[in-house]
Amino acid sequence: MFVQEEKIFAGKVLRLHICASDGAEWLEEATEDTSVEKLKERCLKHCAHGSLEDPKSITHHKLIHAASERVLSDARTILEENIQDQDVLLLIKKRAPSPLPKMADVSAEEKKKQDQKAPDKEAILRATANLPSYNMDRAAVQTNMRDFQTELRKILVSLIEVAQKLLALNPDAVELFKKANAMLDEDEDERVDEAALRQLTEMGFPENRATKALQLNHMSVPQAMEWLIEHAEDPTIDTPLPGQAPPEAEGATAAASEAAAGASATDEEARDELTEIFKKIRRKREFRADARAVISLMEMGFDEKEVIDALRVNNNQQNAACEWLLGDRKPSPEELDKGIDPDSPLFQAILDNPVVQLGLTNPKTLLAFEDMLENPLNSTQWMNDPETGPVMLQISRIFQTLNRT
């Protein structure tokens, strides 16, 4: 019996499920050594009912192994592509590549891009070469534009000095500031959480030390306790914070105040007492660095003095202080207490304003200025106050007017 040679050496016959994109399905038999290209040709003949419509149709289609989602290579055999019996293959037409743009289209697109492109400096100079020039120093104009919040601090420092001199001439100023100072003392007393203070004193810490620790650590008992342990051997641990005085000193101050308020007090004594009140208010404004922030920034390698300066400039904001230390360190700590030039047009315009002149004779205005220096975020509160708001509004208007001119 005669047997063809290709039948003798033929590989294993596989039955494959073929699915076309139009939904047609059929079984195709092929040996393992059949190439993918040959199998694809047979599948296309099946779809075209025995003949190919286009000789290029083979290259325009592809076979995909459904289970692995692989595109089969035309040059490889079914065995090399690891196709198994009863596998499902998808016959799909390849996507036609997008046609290359014509040269005319490319030129039009490039021209459109050039038309939309912003002009460079040379193009601007060429276009404006015939225009008349004006002697305007733009760099100077930009430099003279000042930030209101930055200048406000300088203005407040200078206005505080003027207000103190004006109020020193008021015979009732001493009594007014005594009441205002008493209110400040009450505010400070209210800042100490009695429950937190009791908790620390029950642990055995002295009351004065516990009070100081709570004030330095924002009323946090764990942080205050840690601070007390760390500073137990510190010789200055019993030293009152700025603006505070021991009970004996407070009693002496009260006695002196009562004596000065007597009928026999002279004008000079009243002025001295008012000066002391001003100093006490100023001491309340003295900066107290956040102990936690100081430790954190010093652990980064910064010097303690630099850290305190950074926190003072940035109102105890640790992140802002860190950026200040890493940056150009502007403004400097020395600039914080520096007032505005008394001979400057801005300051003279502020002093000439009737609303400001009237406000400077009000002790509440001075207290507002002091508070805004310590807490810049409180500016909004004082702007809405019926007594201090008009003064702040006039200062802002004068600044904006002169800043534009």
Swiss-Prot record:
CDD domains: UBA1_KPC2 (cd14303), UBA2_KPC2 (cd14304), Ubl_KPC2 (cd17066). The modification N-acetylmethionine is found at M1. It holds the Pfam family UBA_7. Ubiquitous. Residues 101-120, 235-271 are annotated as: Disordered. The keyword Repeat applies. Keywords: Acetylation, Cytoplasm, Repeat, Ubl conjugation pathway. One of its GO terms (cellular component) is cytosol. Residues 108-120 have a biased composition (Basic and acidic residues). Pathway: Protein modification; protein ubiquitination. Component of the KPC complex composed of RNF123/KPC1 and UBAC1/KPC2. Interacts (via ubiquitin-like domain) with RNF123. Interacts (via ubiquitin-like and UBA domains) with the proteasome via its N-terminal domain. Non-catalytic component of the KPC complex, a E3 ubiquitin-protein ligase complex that mediates polyubiquitination of target proteins, such as CDKN1B and NFKB1. The KPC complex catalyzes polyubiquitination and proteasome-mediated degradation of CDKN1B during G1 phase of the cell cycle. The KPC complex also acts as a key regulator of the NF-kappa-B signaling by promoting maturation of the NFKB1 component of NF-kappa-B by catalyzing ubiquitination of the NFKB1 p105 precursor. This is Ubiquitin-associated domain-containing protein 1. It comes from Homo sapiens. The lineage of its organism: Eukaryota, Metazoa, Chordata, Craniata, Vertebrata.
